Amino acid sequence: ACRWSDHYEAIFVEGRAEYRRRDEEIDSHMEIAVSPEDDVEVRRITLTNLSSRRRNIELTSYAEVVLAPQNSDLAHPAFSNLFVQTEILGDSQAILCTRRARAPGENPPWMFHLMTTQGTPGAEVSYETNRATFIGRARSVANPVAFDLPGPLSNTEGSVLDPIISIRQSVIMDADTSANWHLVTGMAESREAALVLIGRYCDPNFAARAFEMAWSHSQLELHQMHATEADAQLYARLASSMIYANPLHRAAAVILTRNRRGQAGLWAFGISGDLPILLLRIADVHRINLVKHVLQAHAYWRGKGLEVDLIILNEDFSGYRQELQDRILNLIGSGPEVYRIDEPGGIFLRRSEDLTEEDRILLQSVSRVILTDSAESLTQQVTRQAPAIRKVPRFAVTRTPSAVMAPEPVPSRDLLFYNGIGGFTQDGREYVVQIRPGKATPAPWSNVLANDRMGSVVSESGAAYTWVDNAHEFRLTPWNNDPISDPSGEAFYLRDEETGQFWSPTPLPAPGNGTYTCRHGFGYSVFEYTQNGINTEVWTYVAVDSPVKFVVVKVRNQSGRARRLSVTGYWEWVLGQWRHSNLMHIVTEVDPASGTLYARNDYNREFAGKTVFVNVNEAARTVTGNRTEFLGRNGTTARPAAMWQDHLSGRTGASLDPCAALQAPFDLAKGQEREFVFLLGAGNDAEEAHQLVRRFSGSAGAKLALECVWEFWKRTLGTVHAETPDPALNILVNGWLEYQTLACRYWGRSGYYQSGGAYGFRDQLQDTTALLNAAPWTAREHLLRAAARQFIEGDVQHWWHPHTGRGVRTHFSDDFLWLPYCACRYVKATGDTGVLDVQVPFLEGRAVNADEESYYDLPQHSDEEGTLYEHCVRAITRGLRFGSNGLPLIGCGDWNDGMNLVGAKGKGESVWLAFFLYDVLRRFSGLARSRNDVAFADRCTQEAE
């Protein structure tokens, strides 16, 4: 919410939800129902003016448009949003949305949103479908720019980059009067069907009918299930724990910490692990009624669209265990879910005697809710209260905040190509951005800090996300892909321990009242800021040779008096692809000797054993591994609850909302400076993690690591130097282009816009060719890496994930040709012909069918090997396939991925590919001749001519 209310109440009954608020003498009552007749949600809002004066009230709706499966949206939200189109229907006070089709036969759905009112209208209705215009850069839904000034929305429509649906309507309300609105959001299979629904629900009476029908339908469902309203309330309450795992209903922490098996361990039971799991443990045949109620709850959820895997574990080891098994089967067979046995979202009946101890631990660990046939009834188990936890004392103010000191003027800098916000330093080695209060860059201006094992994308706001080994598969902190709000799962804070005032040493998430300076350099970023006489300088960088990220906070007291402060670091754990699918399985602990906070996720089968850590070089610190504690209920990183607490609780372990937070209080004399070194890193196992902490902790380790970063990039980027009449080109060529290629493209394979993590066969071969002068070793290692992703037939994986080898096999016609092309370029640039004789295995896998564009799989390594030269020959041979015009067949695309339909029928040809193949043949003929492979050299020459 944008603000706290004077009064707030939420009411849930069958068929609808209700919310009541009171704000500044305005009562609001919102009711929500889903029509059982149409695919629409209706919100009925009633506002009552309790004041003694006339009020002009604006009502603004807001929702973000997806129109795609969840995984598609999560994988790349900014890309997914590009295909959404919006249309304003002013006559109907509605907005239409759809998604442009991307494949033949695709029939995207249509979405609509409308608003009607019964009251005295004020200004004209206005609309917004562009999220950037509504929210504003570096803002959020809590403080959108659309509310800065009264007036209409912009009425933007069309192919907006980030789609929303928002309608604003105002009414004039006299004292002690009410006004009513209906907000309707719905889906249809076609534009015509959507228009029919819009016309229908523009009628307030029909919108009101949805509430009546929703209640009637819910009562009918309960009657058919032989359930009561009280049963439904109980099942709905239990459903909240199925959606948001509640530690109160999960396994004990001691069980969770013992689990060492991943999702694949469930497959032997026919359970995918993709759906929420409820585990019912029963051993007493006399408690069979508990099974009946749980089966009823499961059917109730399925009727509401909540898919849950229900595991019933027969733990009766007596001679009556078969009787219990039969009774359970009879209950299932007599109910509505008889056809859902061993089906996704269905019922899985298993005997405990058939399970190993590891199996039982796994099933308990993955279950969001565990119910037992203990003395408690289902109602008692669901409504069980959490034991009281000793709360951390509130922060006690010991000094009244004085007037906020005027921000010190930021010294002007003589920057090249200054655009009013930022520019390059005179030597071109840093890009400097100045963020004034209330201002922001047009889009996030980020720096990719990386080595070959770890990376982090850091924006000018201080927002960051970090990964190890693979930017897609093993993220340490969340990748958000939101260039508007620029949210972050990493944050730092300074707090005055006398007044309680706090701020971030970076522009986000909790900005102060002054100007921030961000300096992006080669391998590092720096943030400078002064607040109330406290100057901070934050350096962030990644070690050259280890998976360790540094955030060094230098604090200098320029206030003219002694100060007592604290510095806090915060990280939201992911330890996998997505936070929501991993948070249940993350376990944290603190090493009592070093104070390091460790985290692991053994459920992630590809990275099981990885041990992640954070540390700070200050013995007097408090910690927490509980995000709910740090942020608070409905809290944000802009105003975390921890800033109103005396210290952090020290709580870590399993079954928490996982995070890492370290807080270190300190004293600072007048004119004194102190340095705090925060480490974020990961080891392949606990021992490597311990070694990394010991090696890099403290100022000396941080300083040495930074000097190594400087030296590496100075040496690497100093290889190529150009002097041209164009100073802009000089800056790019003399450092930045090669830096971006190596750090972002080759090592990171990630950026702010896209977080792929995979190697693209053509992509990184091209990247390393660009580095032949600066870093030729990258070209050599990647030629061999890429060759190992070639199938025995000569084609290759279009892209693949390192660590696992899973990837995509396609009909692309150019991928494999980049191998001989880049091999020729490498040998010519370096003279290293020995690489051509290195033996590299091939892959084996099924061929791509003629009627499919690609498939994703884990191919096997073949027993057949060949030298890199032989891999190149096989690639060229594969490319010598021509169409009726004598041009190479394009397959499902050449270098232009957008040409994927040209060769859909196996006949399309590519002019571009003909030029490229010609170049490859001419280059490789010379290479073949130098190796005395005259026959293939002649063939290359003949094919080229």
Role assignments for model-derived ranges:
Residues A1-L765, P776-R789, R825-T830, S930:
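Anionic coordination/interaction segments
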Residues I32-P36, N155, V285-N289, T540-V544, ...:
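Alpha-helix capping and helix-loop boundary segments enriched in small/acidic/polar residues
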Residues G273, T719-A722, D726-L729, N734, ...:
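Aromatic-lined, polymer-binding surfaces characteristic
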Residues L279-I282, L880, P888-G891:
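Nucleotide-activated donor-dependent transferases that construct or modify glycoconjugates
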Residues W301, Y493-R495, T768-G886, S910-Y918:
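Aromatic-rich carbohydrate-recognition surfaces in CAZymes
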Residues R390-F395, G845-E853, V902-A904:
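Eukaryote-specific, cytoplasm-facing alpha-helical/coiled-coil scaffolding segments in long proteins
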